[in-house]
């Protein structure tokens, strides 16, 4: 943006020569702002002086020059009377006006003459409206929803109703989502945006495009743990080097306001840039708050010569120190940190000057404000205030010296000392006259050994040495409240004229006959008003002064919020009451935890935001050096046209004089050397609790000005604050003046601490903490509700305990803990309900724990197709069966039968989770993305897409898109782990490009992302059309072998074809010729042949039909189904075919679709439909994606709309028949029934009617860990991996176990990407960052007692990883856990091992030493399980030896 041009003499004065010749005195003074902005008026001030004709017609024109053509775009005209001072306002410039050359021409005419005429170029200001972007929070976790509002306003804060675009961008500036051409309601638009489970962490932005301008709001996405309490640290910002102590206070409170008990570790650390640092560390107890102190000897010891460079440093003025505080809560052991900086000063007191002018006006008074404070931040004592502040005032005249005279003589110097008493506040005013000959002023202040100084070296220039001074005695000037101005001068004052400028506009003008008068600010004056007062002397000189005053904004529109009560208990219903000034207002409310804004800066719309926004409209010069009357007007950004004498004088290079600069430094040494006076310091970095948003409300008040909403207080024990804004057509914006707070708290409550899951047969300690904030200690009975789903292992005969209850005394303002040893007896999620009863209060909490079956989970699915599609009534009978293996874990079996009336039905219902494997890399993430595209395509073609299903699919796609951008590299390519990989992957880049292109019709895809990926792919194509991969291909079937370049090229070609939408002239002919040539030479493996067939079919190659015929010739036929079987030997027992075989069938089906061979493809579709798992997917991600694409394309051709089938399920597993009715209305509904577990499981399925349906038998069960599962490799099962799990333990340490897992690939070459899943022993966790990433370990995921390690690949060389596990819950009788490794893209290649630790907790160990929990006899407590076993073994051995002897 170009700033306003400096106002030259030609701008300031242009009058008719004839008029000047006869004018007896000045006749006019015209002022106008130097800027123009769209949507804003240009107001011109016109004052006709006493020598002016009685009436003057003033015309103002706004001229625009574009393409060398100047036209008038706005004009206004008015008649002004002699002696008047009024304004002439041009209409506002249209909001869509472009940045052109604009000039303002002002002409004054009488009947006889042109009194004045001149023009000036105006600076075009692009800022025309205000846009506020509000989010409910400023910091989000993955998977959270971002709520935001856009508020668009004119500069007067009236609603600006317009169309705008909204863009969400991630930290890499990728476009994630957009809303285009959005219309607002009274300038307000409210939206939500869902973050994915793995978004790019960092600073995201909401960008709003309106009127060719973009407005931004950032929010941060980060992973963090919610703390239960907050810690604050209070210290002085400054500390005197003479102080004997540095004191401070630490406060630790729960978010609901109660004190924290625990331990404090405090560290005093000098922030030195040199050498080795020393520090002081102290530890002590805290109960809500604690005071601390460092004495001068301690501080000197660490600050003196700790850096080893003391001889080069001025230790009398050391650098700052950092004070670090860690508070550890005694109940849970959780720690929180906070720190602050303290700056050391040479003196005990700080003396500051402010509120003084930077220009001297001789013979008028100089005023300033002086503030005296203690360096340590404490208030001045009465004894200290008995001492005066002594101010030495030195006035000099160096006019000749500084005007360039060679004499350099000092003409005058006057010094006086003034004593001032110090009030309790430490702040006082000083005032004294400036001598008539003064041109310089220096002040030095002294107080109890401390000193400060300031100087003014500028002199206001007036030819007649006539001055006025403008002041106000009022503070906190606000809109609507009058304030007083006082004008003083060194000569008799005439009638005064004034004008007020704010935000680049002339907002008020007038005349006053008194030297003391009042003005009443309006909203247009905010946030800062530039007030000019002047009069004209008899000789025509303009005598002026300027005063800039901050004006507090006061909204005409009011909004008030009230809670129906200020305190409430969690889950209690309360009312939020809203009152506004006008009906038909839009109201936006947000209520969040009180600490949310302390953790990160708020993104709320606050008064501070509004004032800052108003400041952006202020575009004057604001030099602060108004040394003459010309500069006074310039200071307010005004253009002036006058025939009066407007003094203008330049600063004559005073500061270029080296001798002057040297003397200035010497005289002000005390003020300049002490650089710490200017140090901003560092605000304490406080870690705060970041809660969920409670209320996000948008409402139109309609005809009401009062509304009430009933809401339920969340279960959190914390404080909630609500803020709001209101907008109406007439009154514009209004804000709540202060947040309204609701304290959600109960003085007596339970906190449960238990593991996320355990395995059946294990026992765990249920930790129950009772918090008592009543005024008295209370006896509490803690009761666990009895259940047949778990046993309570309490055997004590103590009076205060029974099997399911304990009694304890809980002190006031404190907490106490009891432990109950629990043994779950049922599988699944079981509820545990705890009640605490006392004579004065009670609480009850229910929490779930997941109980898993022992052993290793297995699954089996078998499907049948019920094809009754001949448009006539039919019937059919099918049988499904399954036999559980002998080592099945009793009680783990689950049998389910499902039915649905659509080929894609199982997958549509399983969109949220199609496969059983984790998916944490760049390709696997697409399982959240690609299937949704094919489902949407399919349902759209079938005209069965519902709004709910569409929104669900789009949400998955948007989140998948967010996650996938994590894996895009700087060069535009994609790889399995993004920038962590050494290079991009052509295979994965092609896959992502294809999916993004297919998704583009449904969600917002950044076109730059597509272009960069396409360009990178084309850069990896050889001249013969072949593509190559610079890295390693993670898909095992695309790596190695003679035909891998052929397979890769066929794969990439099918992706590039979709880019023709953006680049129609894409040429893939060389690649097609390459594939045709390779096909003619012969393709031996089915996978490569299937991909080539699909690629050739996609472009209509003459070879496509021949390729498909060859592929069909190699197929297997069975029971009306067609499929392909690879030649590789069986790898493991699995009901599912190889992922490779599924992909081959899918590509074959797609080729049939492209070649319009519908009937020939039906047998393939039948086979693919039967291979799905119970979730609706297949074995892995790539086979699931390709198979669903093929099924969706093919099934869309089938006529299955008319459906009415009665399905009946009978057999031993179903004692009473299960019936499913499938018709046209519910054909997409997945109907489910649980069946009884019998051995073997067999069901008969009969179907009658017409249409199409799929029935699926799903079986889930666990198998016991066999002996072979503990060995390195099972030869019998021909496992693809060697796998060994070694447990490192210490019998004296029950809380740490190290796992050493080693694996290698037993097949030829290397595996594809491998996934190692490590299930931890119950009660253990692995610390974050405990496992380092490497060339092999690309990613580690922590997931509720399980680790997922993504391995780049595994070869014949053994790879080992050490996993340190730490106990975080007490669990005894620990069951075996398992470790597995699997080739991700060929899951049949796998190995599984189980493990356990010999060092276990016993039931006696669960309770430790907590009073009231004694499941074992005294003396047995704490014994180790293995020690007990050894003791029994030894005892029996001795017994038998005795018999033998």
UniProtKB/Swiss-Prot annotation:
Signal peptide as annotated in the record: 1-21
Membrane topology of this protein: Lipid-anchor; GPI-anchor
GO CC term (a single one): side of membrane
GO molecular function: serine-type endopeptidase inhibitor activity
Glycosylation sites: 68, 118, 247, 279, 365, 419, 513, 645, 1086, 1355
Cited SUPFAM superfamilies: Alpha-macroglobulin receptor domain, E set domains, Terpenoid cyclases/Protein prenyltransferases
Keywords: Bait region, Cell membrane, Disulfide bond, Glycoprotein, GPI-anchor, Lipoprotein, Membrane, Protease inhibitor, Serine protease inhibitor, Signal, Thioester bond
Chief location bin: membrane
Result of changing residue 1065 to K: In a colorectal cancer sample; somatic mutation
Intrachain disulfide bonds: none
Family: Belongs to the protease inhibitor I39 (alpha-2-macroglobulin) family.
The protein, known as: CD109 antigen
UniProt organism field: Homo sapiens (Human)
Upper lineage: Eukaryota, Metazoa, Chordata, Craniata, Vertebrata
């Amino acid at each position: 943006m170009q700033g306003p041009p400096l106002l030259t003499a030609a701008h300031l004065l242009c009058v008719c020569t004839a008029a000047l010749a006869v004018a007896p005195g000045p006749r006019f003074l015209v002022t106008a702002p130097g800027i123009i902005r769209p949507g804003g008026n240009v107001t011109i001030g016109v004052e006709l002086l006493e020598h002016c004709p009685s009436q003057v017609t003033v015309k103002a024109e706004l001229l625009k020059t574009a393409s060398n053509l100047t036209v008038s775009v706005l004009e206004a005209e008015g008649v002004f009377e002699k002696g008047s001072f009024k304004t002439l306002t041009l209409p506002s410039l249209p909001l869509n006006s472009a940045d052109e050359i604009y000039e303002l021409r002002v002409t004054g005419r009488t009947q006889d003459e042109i009194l004045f005429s001149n023009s000036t170029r105006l600076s075009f200001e692009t800022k025309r409206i205000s846009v506020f972007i509000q989010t409910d929070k400023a910091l989000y976790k993955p998977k959270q929803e971002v709520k935001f509002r856009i508020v668009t306003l004119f500069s007067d804060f009236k609603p600006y109703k317009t169309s705008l675009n909204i863009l969400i961008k991630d930290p890499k500036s990728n476009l994630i989502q957009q809303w285009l051409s959005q219309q607002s309601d009274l300038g307000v638009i409210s939206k939500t945006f869902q973050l994915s489970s793995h978004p790019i962490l960092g600073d995201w932005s909401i960008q709003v495009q309106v009127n060719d301008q973009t407005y931004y709001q950032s929010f941060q996405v980060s992973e963090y743990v919610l703390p239960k309490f907050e810690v604050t640290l209070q210290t002085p910002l400054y500390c005197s080097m003479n102080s004997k102590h540095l004191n401070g206070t630490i406060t630790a409170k729960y978010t609901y306001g109660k004190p924290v008990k625990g331990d404090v570790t405090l560290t005093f650390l000098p922030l030195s840039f040199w050498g080795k640092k020393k520090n002081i560390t102290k530890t002590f107890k805290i109960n809500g708050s604690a005071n601390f102190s460092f004495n001068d000897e301690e501080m000197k010891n660490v600050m003196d010569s700790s850096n080893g460079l003391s001889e080069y440093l001025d230790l009398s003025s050391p650098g700052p120190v950092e004070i670090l505080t860690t508070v550890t809560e005694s109940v849970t052991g959780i720690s929180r940190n906070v720190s602050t900086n303290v700056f050391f000063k040479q003196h005990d007191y700080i003396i500051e000057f402010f509120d003084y002018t930077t220009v001297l006006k001789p013979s008028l008074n100089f005023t300033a404000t002086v503030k005296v404070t203690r360096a340590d931040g404490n208030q001045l004592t009465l004894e200290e205030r008995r001492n005066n502040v002594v101010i030495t005032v030195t006035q000099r005249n160096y006019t000749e010296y500084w005007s360039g005279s060679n004499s350099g003589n000092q003409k005058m110097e006057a010094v006086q000392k003034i004593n001032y008493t110090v009030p309790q506040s430490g702040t006082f005013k000083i005032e004294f006259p400036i001598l008539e000959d003064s041109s310089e002023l220096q002040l030095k202040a002294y107080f109890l050994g401390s000193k400060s100084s300031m100087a003014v070296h500028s002199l206001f220039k007036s030819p007649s040495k006539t001055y006025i001074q403008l002041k106000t005695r009022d503070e906190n000037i606000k809109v609507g409240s009058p304030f007083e101005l006082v004008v003083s001068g060194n000569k008799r004052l005439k009638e005064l004229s004034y004008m007020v400028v704010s935000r680049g506009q002339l907002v008020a003008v007038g005349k006053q006959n008194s030297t003391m008068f009042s003005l009443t600010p309006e909203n247009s004056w905010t946030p800062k008003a530039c007030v000019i007062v002047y009069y004209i002397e008899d000789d025509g000189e303009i005598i002026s002064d300027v005063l800039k005053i901050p004006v507090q904004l006061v909204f005409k529109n009011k909004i008030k919020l009230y809670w129906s009560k200020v305190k409430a208990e969690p889950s209690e219903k309360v009312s939020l009451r809203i009152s506004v000034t006008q009906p038909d207002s839009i109201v936006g409310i947000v209520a969040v935890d009180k600490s949310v804004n302390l953790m990160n800066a708020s993104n709320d719309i606050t008064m501070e935001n509004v004032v800052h926004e108003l400041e952006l409209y202020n575009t004057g010069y604001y030099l602060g050096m108004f040394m003459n009357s010309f500069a006074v007007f310039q200071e307010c950004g005004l253009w002036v046209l006058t025939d009066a004498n407007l003094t203008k004088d330049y600063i004559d290079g005073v500061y270029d004089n080296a001798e002057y600069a040297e003397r200035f430094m010497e005289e002000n040494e005390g003020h300049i050397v002490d650089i710490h006076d200017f140090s901003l310091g560092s605000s304490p970095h406080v870690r705060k609790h970041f809660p969920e948003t409670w209320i996000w409300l948008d409402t139109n008040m309609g005809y009401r000005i009062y509304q009430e909403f009933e809401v339920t207080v969340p279960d959190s024990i914390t404080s909630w604050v609500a803020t709001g804004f209101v907008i109406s057509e007439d009154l514009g914006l209004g804000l709540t003046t202060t947040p309204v707070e609701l304290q959600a708290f109960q003085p007596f409550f339970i906190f449960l601490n238990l593991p996320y899951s355990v395995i059946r047969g294990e026992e765990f300690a249920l930790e129950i903490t009772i918090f008592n904030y009543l005024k008295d200690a209370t006896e509490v009975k803690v009761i666990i509700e009895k259940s047949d789903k778990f046993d309570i292992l309490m055997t004590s005969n103590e009076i205060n305990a029974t099997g399911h209850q304990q009694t304890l005394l809980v002190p006031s303002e404190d907490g106490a803990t009891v432990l109950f040893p629990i043994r779950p007896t049922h599988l699944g999620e079981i509820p545990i309900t705890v009640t605490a009863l006392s004579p004065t209060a009670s609480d009850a909490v229910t929490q779930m724990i997941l109980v898993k079956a022992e052993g290793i989970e297995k699954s089996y699915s078998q499907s049948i197709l019920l094809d009754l599609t001949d448009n006539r009534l039919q019937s059919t009978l099918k049988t499904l069966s399954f036999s559980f293996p002998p080592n099945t874990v009793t009680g783990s079996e689950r049998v389910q039968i499902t039915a649905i009336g659509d080929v894609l039905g199982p997958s549509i219902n399983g969109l949220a989770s199609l496969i059983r494997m984790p998916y944490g890399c760049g390709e696997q993430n697409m399982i959240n993305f690609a299937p949704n595209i094919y489902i949407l395509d399919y349902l759209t073609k079938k005209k069965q897409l519902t709004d709910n299903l569409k929104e669900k699919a789009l949400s998955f796609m948007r989140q998948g898109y967010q996650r996938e951008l994590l894996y895009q590299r700087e060069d535009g390519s994609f790889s399995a782990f993004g920038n962590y990989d050494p290079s991009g992957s052509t295979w994965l880049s092609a896959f992502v490009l294809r999916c993004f292109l297919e998704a583009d019709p449904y969600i917002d895809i950044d076109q730059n992302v597509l272009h960069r990926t396409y360009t990178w792919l084309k850069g990896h194509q050889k001249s013969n059309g072949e593509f190559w991969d610079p890295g390693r291909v993670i898909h095992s079937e695309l790596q190695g072998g003679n035909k891998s370049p052929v397979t890769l090229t066929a794969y990439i070609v099918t992706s590039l074809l979709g880019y023709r939408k953006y680049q129609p002239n894409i040429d893939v002919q060389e690649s097609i010729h390459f594939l045709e040539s390779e096909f003619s030479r012969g393709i031996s493996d089915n996978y490569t042949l299937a991909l080539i067939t699909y690629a050739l079919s996609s472009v209509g190659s003459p070879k496509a039909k021949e390729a498909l015929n060859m592929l069909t010739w190699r197929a297997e036929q069975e029971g009306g189904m067609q499929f392909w079987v690879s030649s590789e030997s069986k790898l493991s027992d699995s009901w599912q075919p190889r992922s490779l075989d599924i992909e081959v069938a899918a590509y074959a089906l797609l080729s049939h679709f492209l070649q319009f061979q519908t009937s020939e493809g039906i047998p393939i579709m039948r086979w693919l439909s039967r291979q799905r798992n119970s979730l609706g997917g297949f074995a892995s991600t790539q086979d699931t994606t390709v198979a669903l694409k093929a099924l969706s394309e093919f099934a869309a051709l089938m006529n299955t709309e008319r459906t009415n089938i009665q399905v009946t399920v009978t057999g031993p597993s179903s004692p009473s028949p299960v019936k499913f009715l499938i018709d046209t209305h519910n054909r997409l509904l997945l109907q489910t029934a649980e069946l009884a577990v019998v051995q073997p499981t067999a069901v008969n399925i009969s179907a009658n009617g017409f249409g199409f349906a799929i029935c699926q038998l799903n079986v889930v069960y666990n198998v016991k860990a066999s002996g072979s599962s503990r060995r390195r490799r099972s030869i019998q099962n021909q496992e693809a991996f060697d796998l060994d799990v070694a447990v490192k333990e210490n019998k004296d340490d029950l809380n740490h176990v190290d796992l050493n897992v080693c694996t290698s690939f037993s097949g030829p070459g290397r595996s594809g990407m491998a996934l190692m899943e490590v299930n931890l022993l119950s009660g253990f966790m692995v610390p974050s960052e405990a496992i380092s990433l490497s060339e092999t370990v690309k990613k580690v995921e922590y997931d509720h007692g399980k680790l997922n390690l993504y391995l780049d690949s595994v070869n014949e060389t053994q790879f080992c990883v050490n996993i340190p596990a730490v106990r975080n819950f007490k669990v005894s009788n620990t069951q075996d856990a398992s470790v597995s490794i699997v080739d991700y893209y060929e899951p049949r290649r796998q190995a599984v091992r189980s493990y356990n630790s010999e060092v276990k907790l016993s039931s006696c160990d669960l309770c430790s030493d907590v009073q009231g929990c004694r499941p074992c006899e005294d003396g047995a407590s704490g014994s180790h399980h293995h020690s007990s076993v050894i003791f029994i073994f030894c005892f029996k051995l001795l017994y038998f030896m005795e018999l033998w002897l």
